[in-house]
UniProtKB/Swiss-Prot annotation:
Residues 240-534 are annotated as: Disordered. Coiled coil: none annotated. It comes from Homo sapiens (Human). The modification Phosphothreonine is found at residue 292. This is CCR4-NOT transcription complex subunit 3. Residues 317-330, 458-467 have a biased composition (Pro residues). Ubiquitous. Highly expressed in brain, heart, thymus, spleen, kidney, liver, small intestine, lung and peripheral blood leukocytes. The gene is CNOT3.
Length: 753
């Protein structure tokens, strides 16, 4: 009798739980259908799942009681079981809706009407992918076993069984990789619709047999497995796009790790099928082609030579450097130019251009570069004695002499080799004061030993030919190791055509030495005066001499960067011959010359406009340094403008409206509104005080108010855990949170007085 009463009590408790669970399920189900967004729906769906699991456990218990013979009246149990099953059906509907909500009805309809051929193709493709993954996993297992065995055989040499096992594993790895390559090729052909699904199905059994039984001792492989698929006729583009599944580098790692002499054969796997030969050969050819291309592209750098750009000197033939055997022809200009000079040159007028002669040998002690030389037509000779012409003012660097170094110079200049190179720039100014019209080369050199000399033809002192009063002369910026063209050649490097003034007959011809000219150029552009004599420049300082010697002995292979000049950069003014003996000086404009390597500038370098602007902006920014508070959000200031109200309205707030008792009579939502939207006011303080009196607690991490829904399940010194109700100020509503851990360090527990 007592057992029956006990059983009836259990049944009553179970049925009570069922009714409560069904009510809870109904409540959550209503919330789910009224949910506004997807996150809430997911949350309610999870709650539904929990409730339905509880009901399912109760249903199992009820089914047990229904099956037993101890209970006579089973109607109530059966009704409750059906009620639970009804809720289960409702949950299945909800679950189906949530799973298919991302797809439209049309999409679901199309999904049911899949093309059978497409479905078959997808199944075969999935089988190929799974088989490739299985083979790759087996390859990884083999490789790890080979590695461990290699370590053991290294410690114990002469273990023949382990070496045989290693060799067998390597053969398995080679065959597996061969099959992986073939299957990947078939998979790509299937994606490209270049192979039939039935053809793949024919080899499916053999491939599965290989995957399952390839390690059996009595396994016999079908060597003609892929012959029917005609993989030898694969387009090359299809093979080229194949991603490398495994590189041969792993084999080389095995070779290095294994000490057996026969392990070297694994670096190039030989598949049993001839279909692989095509793939292997094509891959080897591609590798060889890539290496050949890279070797060809790197060959100039390997040989240590620099490629010569053909568009820089299209007509300048290369001449080996030799010493001249005799004096150069009259009115010819021999000067040095860098090999990479790319400055455009204005062409000389036809009257000043003479026939091009073959390149004369020129002395060059620097690096060889293409040579270009121009020979101008000789001027008509006069009946009187020949007057020596002043050479173009040219410093010469390196231990060389002038162009007449073989004893053939007829001018009065003395060329000084070694210490007269221009050091503060890549190009020097050179100019000439002439007393009779002829072609004169204004040349410059950047530190090599090829000085230039212009020899004028013999002419009378008082009868200069008027037709040649203004002849173009060439000013070519030069560097180390090249020859610049003269005025009569427009095929070489750039040249500037400069009109020269004519000296009156009464002015004596000044003669310069190369050392004096170099000294003048180190101190700046040469200044020509109307005096008949020119003062000798000051001797070179020790700093300049040291810089000069350093530049000469540095042995720079690359030519000094050339100065890019245009007709607007250098303005040379000339005047016609005045009747008086005075001659106006030659005017030169300033140009910025880049420094050559190893040369110190003579004075501070002036800043450009852009650099000055940047400096001014930096200085201005220094006075307004950013502060960390600049990153904070700016709080807008809203002034309180009192609005004039009629006198019959209340002019003062109602009494006792600023007390805690007044705020306690307000609703909870009003208190939350005051707390969140009247920040920094007394009203916020009073609202917080009223909320605390209603047992709400403020969480300083989430900035939300929490209230216990029930007694916490766990209470420690650091936290308490249980079910809480919190006010979500973003969605403006109260939410329930189960199993929430409220850490006391985030509890705002100041006593509000």
């Amino acid at each position: 009798m007592a057992d029956k009463r006990k059983l009836q009590g259990e049944i009553d408790r179970c049925l009570k739980k069922v009714s409560e669970g069904v009510e809870q399920f109904e409540d959550i189900w209503q919330k789910l259908h009224n949910a506004a967004n997807a996150n809430q729906k997911e949350k309610y769906e999870a709650d539904l799942k929990k409730e339905i699991k509880k009901l399912q456990r109760l249903r199992d218990q009820i089914k047990t009681w229904v099956a037993s013979n101890e209970i006579k009246d089973k109607r109530q149990l059966i009704d409750n079981r059906k009620l639970i099953e009804t809720q289960m059906e409702r949950f299945k509907v909800v679950e189906r809706e949530t799973k298919t909500k991302a797809y439209s009805k049309e999409g679901l309809g199309l999904a049911q009407k899949v093309d059978p051929a497409q479905k078959e193709k997808e199944e075969v493709g999935q089988w190929l992918t799974n088989t490739i993954d299985t083979l790759n996993m087996q390859v990884d297992q083999f490789e790890s076993e080979v590695e461990s065995l290699s370590v053991q055989t290294r410690k114990k040499k002469g273990d023949k069984d382990k070496q045989d096992r290693i060799e067998g594993l390597k053969r398995h790895i080679e065959k597996h990789r061969y099959h992986v390559r073939m299957l990947e090729t078939i998979l790509r052909m299937l994606d490209n619709d270049s192979i039939l699904v039935d053809a793949i199905r024919k080899i499916k059994d053999d491939v599965e047999y290989y995957v399952d039984s390839s390690q059996d001792p009595d396994f016999e492989e079908n060597e003609f497995l892929y012959d029917d698929l005609d993989l030898e006729d694969i387009p090359q583009a299809l093979v080229a796009t194949s991603p490398p599944s495994h590189s041969h580098m792993e084999d080389e790692i095995f070779n290095q790790s294994s000490s057996t002499p026969t392990s070297t054969t694994s670096s190039s796997p030989i598949p049993p099928s001839p279909a692989n030969c095509t793939t292997e050969n094509s891959e080897d050819d591609k590798k060889r082609g890539r290496s050949t291309d890279s070797e060809v592209s790197q060959s100039p750098a390997k040989n240590g030579s620099k490629p010569v750009h053909s568009n820089q000197h299209p007509q300048s033939p290369a001449v080996p450097p030799t010493y001249p055997s005799g004096p150069p022809p009259a009115a010819s200009a021999l000067s040095t130019t860098p090999g990479n000079n790319g400055v455009p040159a204005p062409a000389a007028p036809p009257s000043a251009l003479g026939p091009k002669a073959s390149p004369a040998p020129s002395h060059n002690s620097g690096t060889p570069a293409p040579y270009a030389q121009a020979v101008a037509p000789p001027a008509p000779s006069g009946p009187s004695t020949t007057q020596p012409r002043p050479p173009s003012v040219q410093p010469s660097g390196g231990g060389g002499g002038g162009s007449g170094g073989g004893g053939s110079s007829s001018s009065s200049n003395s060329s000084a080799g070694g210490g007269a190179g221009k050091q503060n720039g890549a190009t020097s100014y050179s100019s000439v004061v002439a007393d009779s019209p002829a072609e004169v080369a204004l040349s410059s050199s950047g530190g090599n030993n090829a000085s230039s000399q212009a020899l004028g033809p013999p002419s009378g002192p008082h009868n200069p030919p008027p037709s040649t009063s203004k002849e173009p002369s060439a000013a070519a910026p030069t560097g180390a190791g090249g020859v610049a063209p003269g005025s009569g050649n427009n095929s070489g490097g750039p040249s500037l055509l400069v009109p020269l003034p004519v000296n009156p007959p009464s002015s004596p011809t000044p003669s310069f030495s190369d050392a004096k000219a170099a000294g003048a150029l180190l101190n700046g552009p040469p200044q020509f005066s109307t005096a008949p004599e020119i003062k000798a420049p000051e001797p070179l300082s020790s700093l300049k001499s040291m810089a000069e010697r350093a530049a000469i002995s540095s042995g720079i292979e690359d030519p000094v960067p050339t100065l890019h000049l245009t007709e607007r950069d250098i303005i040379l003014s000339s005047t016609s011959a005045p009747p008086a003996s005075a001659q106006p000086p030659l005017q030169l404009s300033e140009v910025n010359i880049p420094l050559s390597l190893g040369v110190c500038p003579l004075g501070p370098v002036p800043l450009t406009k852009e650099q000055l602007y940047q400096q001014a902006m930096e200085e201005a920014a220094w006075h307004h340094m950013p502060h960390p508070s600049d990153s904070e959000r700016i709080r807008q200031y809203l002034p309180r403008n009192p609005c004039p109200t009629p006198p019959y309205h209340h002019q003062m707030p109602p009494p006792h409206s600023d007390t805690v008792e007044f705020y306690q009579r307000l609703s909870t939502e009003t208190l939350f509104f005051i707390f969140y939207y009247l920040e920094g006011t007394k009203a916020q303080y009073l609202a917080a005080k009223a909320l605390k009196k209603q047992s709400w607690r403020f969480h300083t991490k989430y900035m939300m108010w929490f209230q216990r829904h029930e007694e916490p399940k766990t209470i420690t010194d650091e936290f308490e855990q249980g079910t809480y109700i919190y006010f979500d100020y973003e969605k403006w509503g109260q939410r329930k949170k189960e199993g929430f851990t409220f850490e006391y360090r985030y509890l705002e527990d100041r006593d509000l007085q």
